[in-house]
């Protein structure tokens, strides 16, 4: 078998009709985890419904519908393989909660694939002021997705078909735009494709002999290729933050007969080991970890990305809850945040937002109302330069530095230190009205918290 391939997470972004579903469906279909039987079933259904032309998108729609109905579908359906990687599509927009998911990120994307449509008038609609192309690309960059691939899709519907001139025009415009956001176009592969016909998806297209391939230049090494699949192979694999102190936001806490209290969550940074003395914030409880397990198997250590359950001694289910954060009591233990300074971008709010606004913030697994206590400055959302001090109010499209105060005890961190605990979505009126990254956190000096007997024992034993 050889060594298992590295796992990479991608997020697919772009305007609503750019062909994201068809392109993604095509990759999953040709390289993915969908078995022949399922594909034949989908094809038959698509044909019966007169949707033969949508078969790739249809695959994705079926998966999406199942995902939205809450049927936990086999996640392998969202995976496909390249020569180097196992790639998981962690989200595709069009999904209602796409923006929220991207931020509270069940997992952080290693790379964003931006699909733009080359068809007459389509590209213009997508990149216009109110098109989603800009918003998605800006979001991806703000939330720390620093690698980008651009697929110029629907090359079969340019005038004339497969037009080199049209492709060059789009590359020029998208390059200028992503550069404004912060991406360096020299490091971004641009690939002309047809997600429907399959041009340049997996192998070079005979329809575009003028396309000599894409090239990227970067300090980690240059790369070149022709197809979209090859471009995915140039993604730089993430370095997992094992060297940082432990941060594990709790998703749930269970009481299991004969075992006791078992918090469950995903290790975001650092390493969790049995025997470790951990502190939970903001509740300020310190105790010993008895055992750690994943998929019902005991682990000697859990690493970033692992979803684990762990058994803690002398702590009741009433003491800790979803949204609490677990960390190593001896290495930068997590603490309650008294207040924090954030850079926020207002996405869609019908009115004006002024100081005193108290929406719900979704940050890691916490879901807590926070007050915009002070609007410190309005900034240019691309360059970050200050436009105005103490603005009276903010509206859609504005970016600002805001002082925020949690309405209930909460543990968050700065984005620079612990990215997954430093980005958040602002929810109001059942939608995401803003996104933010945390610049710095003023910690509450908690005084002495509760230290359980088992923690004292473990500390005495000098663990």
Curated annotation (Swiss-Prot):
It is linked to Developmental and epileptic encephalopathy 33: A form of epileptic encephalopathy, a heterogeneous group of severe early-onset epilepsies characterized by refractory seizures, neurodevelopmental impairment, and poor prognosis. Development is normal prior to seizure onset, after which cognitive and motor delays become apparent. Intellectual developmental disorder, autosomal dominant 38: A disorder characterized by significantly below average general intellectual functioning associated with impairments in adaptive behavior and manifested during the developmental period. MRD38 common features are severe intellectual disability, autistic behavior, absent speech, neonatal hypotonia, epilepsy and progressive microcephaly. It is an enzyme of class 3 (hydrolase). Residues 153-156 are annotated as: G4. It comes from the Eukaryota. GTP binds at residues 17-22, 153-154, 156, 194-196. Inhibited by narciclasine. The modification N,N,N-trimethylglycine is found at residue 2. PROSITE patterns: G_TR_1 (PS00301), G_TR_2 (PS51722). Its EC number is 3.6.5.-. This is Elongation factor 1-alpha 2. GO terms for cellular component: cytoplasm; cytoplasmic side of lysosomal membrane; endoplasmic reticulum membrane; eukaryotic translation elongation factor 1 complex; synapse. Homodimer; arranged in a 'head to tail' dimer configuration. InterPro entries: EFTu-like_2, G_TR_CS, GTP-eEF1A_C, P-loop_NTPase, T_Tr_GTP-bd_dom, TRAFAC_GTPase_members, Transl_B-barrel_sf, Transl_elong_EF1A/Init_IF2_C. Residues 91-94 are annotated as: G3. The lineage of its organism: Eukaryota, Metazoa, Chordata, Craniata, Vertebrata. The modification N6,N6,N6-trimethyllysine is found at residues 36, 55, 79, 165. The modification 5-glutamyl glycerylphosphorylethanolamine is found at residues 301, 374.
């Amino acid at each position: 078998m050889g060594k298992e391939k590295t796992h990479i997470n991608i997020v697919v972004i772009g305007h609503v009709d750019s062909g994201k579903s068809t392109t993604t469906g095509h990759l999953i279909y040709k390289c993915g985890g969908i078995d022949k039987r399922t594909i034949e079933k989908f094809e038959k259904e698509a044909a019966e419904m007169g949707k033969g032309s949508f078969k790739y998108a249809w695959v994705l729609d079926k998966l999406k519908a199942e995902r939205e109905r809450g049927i936990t579908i086999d996640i392998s359906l969202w995976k496909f393989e390249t020569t180097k990687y196992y790639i998981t599509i962690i989200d595709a927009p069009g999904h209602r909660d796409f923006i929220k998911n991207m931020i509270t990120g069940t997992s952080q994307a290693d790379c964003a694939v931006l699909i733009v449509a080359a068809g007459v008038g389509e590209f213009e609609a997508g990149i216009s002021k109110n098109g989603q192309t800009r918003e998605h690309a800006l979001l991806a960059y703000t939330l720390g997705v620093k690698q980008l691939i651009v697929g110029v899709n629907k090359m079969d519907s340019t005038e004339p078909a497969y037009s080199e001139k049209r492709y060059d025009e789009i590359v020029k415009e998208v390059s200028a735009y992503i550069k404004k956001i912060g991406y360096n176009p020299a490091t971004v592969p641009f690939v002309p494709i047809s997600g429907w016909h399959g041009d340049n998806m997996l192998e070079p297209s005979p329809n575009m002999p003028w396309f000599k391939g894409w090239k990227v230049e970067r300090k980690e090494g240059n790369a070149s290729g022709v197809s979209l699949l090859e471009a995915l192979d140039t993604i730089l694999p993430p370095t997992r933050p094992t060297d940082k102190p432990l941060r594990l936001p709790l998703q749930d806490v269970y009481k299991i007969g004969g075992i006791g209290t078992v918090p469950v969550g995903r290790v975001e940074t650092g390493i969790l080991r049995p025997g470790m003395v951990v502190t939970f914030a903001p509740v300020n409880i310190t105790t010993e970890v008895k055992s750690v397990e994943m998929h019902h198997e005991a682990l000697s250590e859990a690493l970033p990305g692992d979803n684990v359950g762990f058994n803690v001694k002398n702590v009741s289910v009433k003491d800790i809850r979803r949204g609490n954060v677990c960390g190593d009591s001896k290495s930068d233990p997590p603490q309650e945040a008294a207040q924090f300074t954030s850079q926020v971008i207002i996405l869609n709010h019908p009115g004006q937002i002024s100081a005193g606004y108290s929406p719900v913030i979704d940050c890691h697994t916490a879901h807590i109302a926070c007050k915009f206590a002070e609007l410190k400055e309005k900034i240019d959302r691309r360059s970050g330069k200050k436009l105005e001090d103490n603005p009276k109010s903010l509206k859609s499209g504005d970016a600002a530095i805001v002082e925020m105060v949690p309405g209930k005890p909460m543990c968050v961190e700065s984005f620079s230190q612990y990215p997954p605990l430093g980005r958040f979505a602002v929810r109001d009126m059942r939608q995401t009205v803003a996104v933010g990254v945390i610049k710095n956190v003023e910690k509450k000096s908690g005084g002495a918290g509760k230290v359980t007997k088992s923690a004292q024992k473990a500390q005495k034993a000098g663990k």
